[in-house]
A protein has these predicted regions:
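N-terminal periplasmic accessory domains that precede
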Residues: 89, 98-101, 118-121, 130-133, ...
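Gram-negative outer-membrane beta-barrel transporters
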Residues: 394, 435, 539-549, 566-646
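Short acidic/polar hinge/loop motifs at secondary-structure boundaries
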Residues: 138-167
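C-terminal beta-signal and adjacent terminal beta-strands/loops
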Residues: 243, 492, 550, 668-716
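Short, acidic, small-residue-rich periplasmic hinge/interaction motif at the N-terminus
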Residues: 25-91, 99, 127
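Transmembrane beta-barrel wall of Gram-negative outer-membrane proteins
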Residues: 207-236, 247-306, 329-340, 384, ...
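Outer-membrane beta-barrel signature, preferentially recognizing the C-terminal barrel domain
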Residues: 315-317, 321-336, 340-342, 460-477, ...
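Flexible loop and strand-edge segments within Gram-negative outer membrane beta-barrel domains
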Residues: 274-280, 293-349, 355-377, 410-418, ...
C-alpha cells in the first residue's frame, strides 16, 4: 500500500508544469516523408514554435497543416489532432497487437482480450466505433466482429502508426466516432532508394512471454523508376507472466469459498496466464513504378497467426471452462496509384484498393475446429485533391466496400451474410493566416443481406441504412505559438452485422451473443474545445469533449445463462460521453550533451446510458508522467503511470482496482547516421497486478507482469 501511494505521488509530481502531455500538434514542424506512405506537410512553422529536442523520437511531430496518411487531402486537422508514433518510440513500444502498441498515447486504452487480441480503445470507444486501416483502407478482417478476433495487421511491419480524430476521420467512414488508427508500411514503395538496396529490420526479445520476434524488409531499385519490395516477419510467445493471481480478488474469494476442490484450485493460478501463447508469421512482396509525384504499384501478402484466448473460468462445477485458440490466415492484394494532374482545379488523383481472402478457425481444447469464419471482401477508394487557391483547399472522393461473410460450426452465432457499402465524402479547408477553418461531410449507404438459417433460427433478413455525417472546425492563433479551437460534429452510424443478427454461442468470447434486427441508425452530436501552445523548450495542449447519442448501440451481460454461457445482448438507448485529454512537455535543464525533459499525459472519460447508468467498459482516470534525458546518440527515460479505480460500473460489471506502474528505457544509436538503434526497456518494474476495465476478460486475464525487453532496429 505504501509503495503504491509513493508511486502514485511520483506520477503527480512529474505532472505540474507539464500537466498537458506532449501536444506535438502545437509544434508545427513538417512531417518528413519516411517512405512509409507519409507525405511531407507544408513547412509553415513560425519562429515562436519550439523545435523538437535533440534526438527526440518520443512522438512524431505534427503540423498545423498535415497530410492525412493514406490520403493526399490536406487539412489543418482541427477537431482533435493527429498523433503519430515512429522511430525509437515505435521500436520501444511495439507489441504483438495494435492495441498494446498504442496504449500509452493520450486518450488511448486497449481492449486487452489477452495479449494477442487487443484493439485500441479511443476516448472510451472500441469495436465498430474505431476504424483500423492499413495505408488508408480497412484491414479487411473480422477483428471488429468480436473482441477475441485479432487485427490481421502485424505492428512489426509498421513504419509509422497514426491516430486520427476529427473532420479528417470522416474521409474513412461514419463509424469512426472514436477515431481512426492508420498503420503505414512500405509494401507498396513510394520512393526510389538512393542506394543499390535499402534494408530495414527489427529484432525483439521480451521476457514476460519469452517473446521472440523479427522483421526484415528490402527495397531494390530495378531500372530507373521501378522498385521491388519484399518483407517477412515471425514472432512467437509463450504463456505470459503476470504480476499476481489470474482471478481478480472478488472472483478469487468466491473460488476459495467453494466446496469443490477443482474450483478452489482456480484461486491458486498465479504467475502465468494460461492459454495466452501465440505464433505469427507474415510475408509480403510488392512493386511500384515511381516518377516524381506519380506512382503506381501493388503488393501481395499472407498473414498467419495461431494464438490462445485466456480462459474465462466458471465457478460453477457443472460448467466446463473452455480454452479456445484461434487459427487465422489472410491473403491480401493491394494496389495504389497517385497521379499528379499539374495545374488547374485538381492537384492530384489517388486511387487505392484492396482484396482479401480471410478465414479463421476457433479451436477447441482438443484441437478440433469448433467454429469456422470465412470472409472475402474488397475495398476501393478514389480521392480527388483540389489545388490550393487563395487559402482554399481540400478534396472529395468516393469509397466502396463489399464483404461476403460466413460462420459455420457447432457454435455458429451469425447467419451467412453480405455487406455492400458506398461512401461519398468531401473535406474543405480555409487558411486565413491566424484563422483556419475546416468542414467535412460524408454520405454512406449500407446494405446488409442475411440468409435464412435454421440453426440459429432467423429468417432471411435485409436491412438498408443511409447515414449522413458532417463536421465543422475553427481555430485561431491568439499569440505566437498559441491557438484555440472549437469544433462540432453530427454523425450517423449504421449498426454492424453482429449488432443486428448475432444469435448463438461464441466460443472465442465464451459468451452467448444476441443481436437485434430492429436496431436503427446510431446518431450523435459532438463538440470539442482545444488549446495548443508551444514555446522555447515546452509544448502544451488540452482538449475537452462532449458527445450526445440518440440510439447508442451497446452490448451488455443480461445475467442469464444459455448453453452454459453468460448471455450478452445488444440494446439501443440514448447516451452521453464527455471527458478531457491533457498533454505537455517542458525542458528543465541541459547537462552536458543531454536535454532533460519532463512530460505528462492525462485522460478521462465519463459515459452514461439513459435508463441503464454507466456505460460498460469505460477506462478510468489515468495520469502518466515521465522524465527523459535526450542527446544525439543516447536517450534514457523513466515514467510512472497511475490508473484510478473504476467503481463507476454498468449492470453485471465488477469494479476494477487501479494500479501504479513504473517503466524505464534506454536507447542507443550506435552509428553517426542515427538510422539504427538499440532499445533496452523494463516495463512494470515492480511486477504489479494490473487490469484494464475496458477488457471483457479483465477479471480473468491481468496485464503483463515485469517485462524486460531488448529491441534492435537497423537500416542500411
Amino acid at each position: 500500500m505504501l509503495r503504491s501511494a509513493l508511486l502514485a505521488g511520483a506520477a503527480f509530481a512529474l505532472l505540474p508544469g507539464t500537466a498537458f502531455a506532449q501536444a506535438q500538434d502545437a509544434t508545427p514542424t513538417p512531417v518528413a516523408d519516411d517512405g512509409a506512405g507519409g507525405t511531407a506537410a507544408p513547412a509553415d512553422a513560425t519562429a515562436a514554435d519550439a523545435p523538437p529536442a535533440q534526438g527526440d523520437d518520443r512522438r512524431a511531430p505534427e503540423s498545423q497543416d498535415i497530410v492525412v496518411t493514406g490520403s493526399r487531402i490536406r487539412g489543418p486537422d482541427l477537431l482533435a489532432g493527429t498523433t503519430a508514433i515512429t522511430g525509437e518510440e515505435l521500436t520501444r513500444d511495439v507489441r504483438p497487437s495494435i492495441g498494446e502498441t498504442l496504449q500509452h498515447l493520450p486518450g488511448v486504452s486497449a481492449s486487452s482480450f489477452g495479449p494477442n487480441a487487443s484493439r485500441p480503445v479511443l476516448r472510451g470507444f472500441q469495436g465498430e466505433r474505431v476504424s483500423i486501416l492499413t495505408d488508408g483502407i480497412g484491414s479487411l478482417d473480422v477483428s471488429s466482429t468480436s473482441a477475441d478476433h485479432a487485427v490481421a495487421i502485424n505492428p512489426l511491419t509498421a513504419d509509422r502508426i497514426d491516430v486520427l480524430r476529427g473532420p479528417t476521420a470522416l474521409l474513412y467512414g461514419t463509424s469512426a466516432i472514436g477515431g481512426v488508427v492508420n498503420v503505414l508500411d512500405s509494401r507498396i514503395p513510394r520512393r526510389v532508394p538512393t542506394d543499390h538496396v535499402h534494408i530495414d529490420g527489427i529484432l525483439t526479445y521480451g521476457s514476460a512471454a519469452n517473446e521472440r520476434s523479427g522483421n526484415a524488409a528490402a527495397d531494390l531499385p530495378v531500372g530507373g523508376n521501378f522498385v521491388v519490395h519484399v518483407d517477412g516477419n515471425y514472432s512467437q510467445t509463450d504463456d505470459m507472466d503476470i504480476g499476481g493471481y489470474a482471478l481478480a480478488p472478488a472472483l478469487r474469494a468466491q473460488a476459495l469459498a467453494s466446496a469443490d476442490p477443482a474450483i478452489r484450485a482456480l484461486a491458486d493460478i498465479r504467475g502465468t496466464l494460461p492459454n495466452s501463447a501465440a505464433k505469427t508469421w507474415d510475408i509480403a512482396a510488392g512493386a511500384a513504378w515511381i516518377s516524381g509525384e506519380n506512382n503506381v504499384g501493388f503488393s501481395i501478402n499472407h498473414y498467419d497467426s495461431l494464438y490462445g484466448v485466456p480462459i474465462r473460468y466458471s465457478l460453477d462445477p457443472a460448467i466446463d471452462a473452455e480454452a479456445p485458440r484461434l487459427d487465422i490466415a489472410q491473403t491480401r492484394i493491394d494496389g495504389r496509384a497517385e497521379i499528379d494532374t499539374g495545374t488547374g482545379f485538381l492537384d492530384s488523383i489517388q486511387l487505392r484498393g484492396g482484396y482479401s481472402d480471410y478465414r479463421h478457425f476457433e479451436l477447441e481444447q482438443s484441437g478440433a475446429i469448433g467454429t469456422r469464419f470465412d470472409s472475402t471482401g474488397y475495398e476501393g477508394r478514389a480521392e480527388f485533391v483540389q489545388s490550393t487557391r487563395q487559402g482554399w483547399g481540400g478534396g472529395f472522393g468516393a469509397q466502396y466496400f463489399h464483404r461476403d461473410f460466413a460462420v459455420a460450426g457447432a457454435e455458429k452465432f451469425l447467419p451467412d451474410n453480405s455487406t455492400n457499402q458506398l461512401g461519398l465524402f468531401a473535406l474543405e479547408t480555409l487558411d486565413r493566416g491566424a484563422f483556419k477553418g475546416e468542414a467535412s461531410v460524408r454520405y454512406e449507404h449500407t446494405a446488409y443481406d442475411a440468409d435464412a438459417d435454421p440453426i440459429i433460427g432467423n429468417p432471411a433478413l435485409t436491412r438498408n441504412f443511409n447515414a449522413f455525417s458532417a463536421a465543422l472546425g475553427a481555430q485561431y492563433t491568439v499569440a505566437p505559438g498559441w491557438r484555440i479551437g472549437l469544433n462540432a460534429s453530427r454523425t450517423e452510424r449504421a449498426p454492424s452485422v453482429e449488432e443486428l443478427f448475432a444469435n448463438g454461442p461464441h466460443g472465442g468470447t465464451q459468451s452467448f451473443e444476441i443481436g437485434d434486427p430492429g436496431i436503427d441508425l446510431e446518431k450523435s452530436w459532438g463538440i470539442e474545445a482545444t488549446i495548443r501552445g508551444a514555446g522555447e523548450g515546452y509544448t502544451l495542449g488540452a482538449s475537452v469533449f462532449h458527445s450526445w447519442f440518440n440510439g447508442y448501440i451497446y452490448e451488455t451481460p443480461t445475467g442469464a445463462i444459455q448453453d452454459d454461457l453468460p448471455v450478452f445482448q445488444y440494446f439501443q438507448a440514448n447516451a452521453r460521453y464527455y471527458g478531457f485529454e491533457l498533454e505537455g512537455s517542458v525542458k528543465v535543464a541541459r547537462i552536458g550533451n543531454f536535454d532533460i525533459n519532463l512530460d505528462g499525459v492525462g485522460d478521462y472519460v465519463h459515459a452514461t446510458i439513459a435508463g441503464s447508468g454507466p456505460a460498460p467498459r469505460i477506462p478510468p482516470l489515468r495520469l502518466l508522467g515521465g522524465i527523459e534525458a535526450q542527446s544525439d546518440r543516447i536517450n534514457g527515460r523513466v515514467e510512472v503511470e497511475w490508473v484510478a479505480d473504476q467503481n463507476r460500473i454498468a449492470a453485471f460489471e465488477t469494479p476494477t482496482d487501479g494500479y501504479t506502474m513504473v517503466n524505464a528505457s534506454l536507447s542507443f544509436r550506435p552509428f553517426h547516421d542515427n538510422r539504427s538503434s538499440i532499445v533496452l526497456s523494463a516495463n512494470n518494474i515492480f511486477d504489479v497486478d494490473a487490469r484494464r476495465h475496458a477488457s471483457f476478460l479483465k477479471d480473468y486475464a491481468p496485464l503483463s507482469g515485469r517485462d524486460l525487453r531488448i529491441s534492435a532496429r537497423f537500416t542500411f
